[in-house]
Amino acid sequence: MSKSIPELYGSLVFNDSEMKARLPKDIYKALAKTINSGSHLELDVANSVAVAMKEWALEHGATHFTHWFQPMTGITAEKHDSFLSPTGVGEAIMEFSGKELVKGEPDASSFPSGGLRATFEARGYTAWDPTSFAFIKGHTLCIPTAFCSYSGEALDKKTPLLRSMEAVSKEATHLLHILGKTDVKRVNTTVGAEQEYFLVDKECYRLRKDLIFCRRTLFGAPAPKGQEMDDHYFGSIKPRVEAFMEELNEELWKLGIPAKTEHNEVAPAQHELAPVFETVNVAVDHNQLVMEMMKKVADRHDLACLLHEKPFEGINGSGKHNNWALSTDTGENLLNPGKTPAENTQFLLFLAAVVEAVDDYADLLRISVATAGNDHRLGANEAPPAVVSLFLGEELEAVVDSIKSEIYFEGKGAVQMSIGPKVLPHFTKDNTDRNRTSPFAFTGNKFEFRMPGSSLSLSGPNVILNTAVAESLAGFCKVLDGLTGSELDLAIHKLLKDTFTDHARIIFNGNGYTDEWLAEAKKRGLPNLKSTPEALPHLIAEKNIELFTKHHVLTKEELFSRYEILLEDYAKTIHIEAKTMEEMVQKDFLPSLFSYVNDLACTGSTKKELVPGITTKAEEKLITKLSGLADTISDELDILKDMIGTAEGMDDYLKAGTYYHDTILAEMETIRLAVNDAEVLIPEDYLPYPTYDALLFYI
């Protein structure tokens, strides 16, 4: 690394310090006002910003610019335009206008719209999000933007997120003003995204069609060793992986992404990266860049980065923990309980709002993480169950119980930890333990939403959280508005008691992996939406439509479009997996099996010719076993082909998605098990693809 980290950090970002240095004072102030308060950006300001941004980009080797946006595909999109502008006399100049900065016009017809746009209705618009800084990637200036249709409907992940940020800020600020904090002008959602991923050798990756097409293995007998020794988690990082991590950090730091923590995860070949908290729209943008850079840097190290939620059967899959908090523009974390949480009225109000929101909109939180990949992970004793519950920890649950019962809470105070040997330091014990089985856990000064899958855009979960909490806060403001003094105190006390009493069912501090909890959750009336097709219809329930439209986050039409897009994506994902399985079995695995059986038969015949009367029992036993498995695989493959044909004839995506989940996935599992049984009997040099041994342990 030629530069120090402070010199490197943000060097490819047109950030606040660059703007301050390059823009005239009046222009900088106008832009800062837009960024901080959301005021309208005048064209003359945009023109000045565009000129400064272009000059900065050219100095860093950029030749093109792009409006970088996040359509409903869940990944980013970009179209590159050069700064070049011919003069008409055989020469060219480099130009970039305020209009080009503020607005773009990509073709909207080729992106998912869920029926909002017909194919012939091609015009769409991208609009600059000045709260997320422009950056340089390669030779291209990337300008973060929102994406909408010609008629103004949101066609992306960013627009509803920005709307939800405004909604929760409005209601949280209102509540703080009621409490007397009138200096607060804005409340920001902050997020830290813990990104899990796998690294495998690139050559092994290229030999697996399932990894290429499906991002997960469709077959694979378990390696002799998995994760049962607990020796990979936080273990020593292998040199090849360490080199990848070092370069990844450098690339992320250049882009102003505050990558902080890196370590081995539980499963072999699994790792994690975690950044410092940022404002949610910036955190979501940065997480998209993190995933992109992971793949690019891995490729340069002859590795492949797998972001699927369950790339390997029999070991842990990958998630993306969404650490969520609320902070004021004056620098206060509203989820910080302080030293005496029982006496912290402000904290208790915001805690109650989150508890109510999670209970009332648990179905939406489940939907926000519903994908074909994540269905393999949730509820599998490696990730939270599909039932949404909320963990508070021992002390906070006791505080809540005291409010409900109106019994004075006597805190234990700070507890000093002493491990034993005098040489080891004493330190203060945290108020809450960590519950890794909880979908939604309070972890000291934030909530950790643990259900999102590793490949997911975090826009969806945070849109739900922001909007649901905004609804709770709006209800609180309605009750408390206009009250002062003792009247306000009494109203707050009653509000807290009623809220914690009415929503007590969502609070659970125990082991979420047990069958006993699932039975208890059912008794409490908590939804258990086990699969994506089961969950998605709840998105368009009347109460949820009302929530989004009331807070101007999504229109009814935009909500229905997302319902259609998510269903279609689910069905198409399983369809691709089924077709890939069909091809791998038909063209690759069965021919390899037949080749080995043929060689076994030849070996047996040769032995008998060379040594008359010699036994060939071992060969015959293996041939019989493999031939039986081949028949099973072939028969089941015929069944799968018929099922695929049936699904292809369905024009209702909910019906198709349900069929893929209930019928086709079950048949694919039958084939997987038969192939795995055969795989362990066949030498590796006959197999058409690398085994789990090579994929997980040969880096």
Report the location of each language-model feature.
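Gly-rich Lys/Arg/Thr-decorated short loops/hinges at beta-loop-alpha junctions or inter-strand turns
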Residues: 2-15, 34-36, 224-233
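Short linear, low-complexity motifs centered on an aromatic residue
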Residues: 74-89, 109, 208-210, 215-217, ...
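C-terminal amphipathic alpha-helical interaction region
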Residues: 501-699
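N-terminal flexible segment immediately upstream of the FAD-binding catalytic core
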Residues: 1-26, 140-141, 264-273
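Active-site proximal loops enriched in glycine and acidic residues that flank catalytic Cys/His/Asp
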Residues: 45, 69, 97, 275, ...
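Active-site core of metal-dependent hydrolases
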Residues: 9-120
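Glycine-rich, acidic/polar active-site loops that bind/position phosphate-bearing ligands
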Residues: 121-307, 316-319, 326-564
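Active-site-proximal loop/turn and secondary-structure-junction residues that shape catalytic pockets
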Residues: 45-49, 69-71, 99-100, 147, ...
